[in-house]
UniProtKB/Swiss-Prot annotation:
GO terms for cellular component: plasma membrane-derived thylakoid membrane. This is Photosystem I assembly protein Ycf3. GO terms for biological process: photosynthesis. Signal peptide: none annotated. It comes from Synechocystis sp. (strain ATCC 27184 / PCC 6803 / Kazusa). It is found in: Cellular thylakoid membrane. InterPro entries: PSI_Ycf3_assembly, TPR-like_helical_dom_sf, TPR_rpt, Ycf3/AcsC/BcsC/TPR_MFPF. Its main location: membrane. The keyword Membrane applies. Pfam families: TPR_12. Keywords: Membrane, Photosynthesis, Repeat, Thylakoid, TPR repeat. TPR repeats lie at residues 35-68, 72-105, 120-153. Essential for the assembly of the photosystem I (PSI) complex. May act as a chaperone-like factor to guide the assembly of the PSI subunits.
Amino acid sequence: MPRTQRNDNFIDKSFTVMADIILKILPTNQKAKEAFVYYRDGMSAQADGEYAEALDNYEEALRLEENPNDRSYILYNMALIHASNGDHEKALGLYQEAIELNPKMPSALNNIAVIYHFQGEKAKEAGQEDDAENLFDKAAEYWKQAIRLAPNNYIEAQNWLKITGRSEMDVFF
């Protein structure tokens, strides 16, 4: 049974009904509508912690979806799952693909920076200072890009950039 038919709380049911109405009235082709159904089911499964099911749905949505912007969000959600499961390399690749399709996605840029920062901390703990600094520099570059796109967000990153001397004043204004 499709996930959309299993929603058992009011909010999920309401969202499903509204999404179905929108799908019926929007002038999109059948393939795009099917892609959206898989994407919606993927988001629902992801919210429930059913990551394997979510990835299956996202894969199918990605196969069907042709719109680059929509594909970027599918890739982004897939990356979130891989990152939360500790597969940072896979997540980085998916975030990069998402950014290639949608360069103005600050959340993907931020998440890449978070992964590089995490890896930098691990390298530092292992006594690999040069590797740590390189990873921190990568994190800084991605955070700067994210902050340029969303200057009111990522306050902790802005503070980290200032504290570590990795910021330029024009980034924040």
